[in-house]
Amino acid sequence: MVSLTKRVLFEVIPNPPDETTLTLSSTTNKGHYISVRPFVNAEGKEFPFEWAFGGTSDHIELKKINERANSLNFNFKFDTNVKLNVPETHRGVIKTVFKTWDSGLVEETGSVFPWGTEGTEVKFRELWQPVDPTRLEFVELNNEKDVDQAANSIALSVDNEEYEGLVIVVGRWIQGILFKKGVNTLDGINLFRSQIDEKNSIVSLVKFGADADKFPQEVLLNEGSITTSKGLEWSVIESNL
């Protein structure tokens, strides 16, 4: 099921909750996913993101707990913290539980181990508001299941000797991660968030990185298609067009 959710609360327990980003997480019908988390106030920040990560359906395990809750175990293919070798960064599987409230908000709980699996467990909690991916403005959905099943669900990927990346399209919203292999600095990280307007043109909202112009300029493509941007070939690994 296509999903676009906006984070409205982040809490590292036992600290008080807060939200300093405009975080959106996108998931396609087949389970390919990406989360891009730019700071609302990025002034003075060399890297204006709290975090960004993503992966294909091979990098997530979902199990149903009951009608309202699922366990999701993530093992990200793309993780900016790992890419940058940020100290005290969790590596490996992150176990989470997603529970839908009566209001339609989705609570995510889980824990990470920044000092390794033998180190101290750090618990966290996030709250997500499902939004309509077919709209250019943020329109809240009463329930994530209310999303238009005909909404665009497209994923593009690249993996060659120099680059690896993933782009997710849900409805009118596009998010992408592109890493330059072997470059574990900000020079090796590219992120973007865009929208598809009424004329099917791509309008950039967030763009970061020296190679950000290599993100695909056309995304409304059939599965199996190839598109090239600034010499970089992207393969469409999922499309419902």
UniProtKB/Swiss-Prot annotation:
CDD domains: HRI1_C_like (cd11693), HRI1_N_like (cd11692)
GO cellular component labels: cytoplasm; nucleus
Keyword Nucleus included in the entry's annotation: yes
Keyword Nucleus appears in the UniProt entry: yes
Keywords: Cytoplasm, Nucleus
Protein name: Protein HRI1
Pfam families reported for this sequence: HRI1
Stored Gene3D superfamilies: Protein HRI1, C-terminal domain (2.40.128.310), Protein HRI1, N-terminal domain (2.40.128.320)
Family: Belongs to the HRI1 family.
Gene name for this UniProt entry: HRI1
Main location as per UniProt: cytoplasm
Cellular compartment(s): Cytoplasm; Nucleus
